[in-house]
């Protein structure tokens, strides 16, 4: 589905296939930039913390394999905040320390991520400019200017509504499953408008705004897949900032 979204917006993109099957022979010319973000679930402090033992984490090593083989001029690897020892292990492999950037500096959501990159002066420029960037509120991203939240528990339903005057919580790939009362993705079962006592979800367009993706960028696939792609993706303006350094 992400390929469908990419080709709709950039039809000349060359899809080279599964990273596990790629070798240097698949890239006849030199590579200027290698960007990756291996699945974060294995590393996340919110998950089971299987780290390198999680089957999904193997794609990190596929990224490293290609990075060593292709020797790109620059690289960026993104992932979630994780245990310090795992973070240190990744840093030792890549030879650089990560830079923590919260998407709240560039958008209306709190999304703390680690970025390993050899692009120079990113940390220095972030320190110099971060105070000027956090101007976008969650409220400005929403169509109705209200962030309505509810959690529905069997036999004990309760609803909460609060204005979105600050940053929205982090968008994840599982967003479509629901939102808890504190704004974190959860497993609320009923969706609808607030007037009927149910939850109002952020629309795909509002989620695109959270990720600083152009409105309508993910159109053309089912709504579930739009949420999935946006939750798994980068905050565009964060990557743009890194590349501008």
What do the PLM-derived regions correspond to, one by one?
Residues 1-245:
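Conserved active-site and SAM-binding loop architecture
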